[in-house]
Amino acid sequence: MTVTAAMVKDLREKTGAGMMDCKKALAETNGDMEAAIDWLRAKGIAKADKKSGRTAAEGLIGIASAGNKAVVVEINSETDFVARNDAFQDLVRGIANVALGTDGTVEAVSQATYPATGKSVEDSVKDAIATIGENMTLRRAAALKVEDGVVATYIHNAAGDGIGKLGVLVALKSTGNKEALNAIGRQVAMHVAATNPLAVRPSEIDPAVAERERNVFIEQSRASGKPDNIIEKMVDGRMRKFFEEVALLSQAFVMNPDQTVEAAIKEAEKTVGAPIEVAGIARLLLGEGVQKEESDFAAEVAAAAKG
């Protein structure tokens, strides 16, 4: 396969690697972008997370909650100017509230009735396009619910009540005090905003993702020239560290890095008055997956927590 300049540019943007390294990586992997990223990582040239968390699409994230259930939606617009428009912001809040009555899938939310117009959300968005004069779309949605407990929420870079650039839901099961439960839930939600864990527990991480990491670690370890039995131990150690870093409960708590999230939740059980189980998390970053200048969310959220 011919390696084009556009492919090299794309790989450079995703990895931060040099032009010649990117060109060689694409040549070695027959133009497969994901394989080229792994090739660069195996050579120690690119970081695993460089390609993720980039944003370009404008618009807003909206959140609506009702105690034991909450939803988060992403509505995209073409420009940030429209995202600051009162009519657009009201639309995002309205769609989030409608989403509360659905299972949280884009399909269900799109077909639900939007009270302000009596039409479906999908048709109401089309009407808004004609009125505001800019294309917009319901891109993503998620919902979490617990029978007994709370779904805590957090909006980062808030543009108003319930709307912003990053939204997080954290579902906590517990029979304890709901106010205290929501307090620790909000802290965990802020942590999720900062660290973007892949799953709550190591056992819940996608096996395909874990296998991909293992393969990269194997290739990196082989470069050491050590015997296979030593390489296996090295890889096992790096995989343990990988799981600790990407699973929520084993991560160092942003609010207090001296303890894990799991330890912080265990400590909160004293105030809540009952055991707490993290039943699920959801995190939507505006325009996630599309190129734009990156932000240090860990630093931003930590600063917001202290302020």
Curated annotation (Swiss-Prot):
Gene behind the chain: tsf
Keywords: Cytoplasm, Elongation factor, Protein biosynthesis
Origin superkingdom: Bacteria
InterPro entries: EF-Ts_dimer_sf (IPR036402), Transl_elong_EFTs/EF1B (IPR001816), Transl_elong_EFTs/EF1B_dimer (IPR014039), Transl_elong_Ts_CS (IPR018101), UBA-like_sf (IPR009060)
Main subcellular localisation: cytoplasm
Entry-linked SUPFAM superfamilies: Elongation factor Ts (EF-Ts), dimerisation domain, UBA-like
PROSITE patterns: EF_TS_1, EF_TS_2
Claim: Cytoplasm is one of the keywords in the record: yes
Entry keyword annotation includes Membrane: no
NCBIfam families: tsf
A Pfam family recorded for this sequence: EF_TS
Protein name per the record: Elongation factor Ts
Function per UniProt: Associates with the EF-Tu.GDP complex and induces the exchange of GDP to GTP. It remains bound to the aminoacyl-tRNA.EF-Tu.GTP complex up to the GTP hydrolysis stage on the ribosome.
Location in the cell: Cytoplasm
Species, as recorded: Sinorhizobium fredii (strain NBRC 101917 / NGR234)
Entry's family note: Belongs to the EF-Ts family.
HAMAP family assigned to the protein according to its UniProt record, in alphabetical order: EF_Ts
GO cellular component: cytoplasm
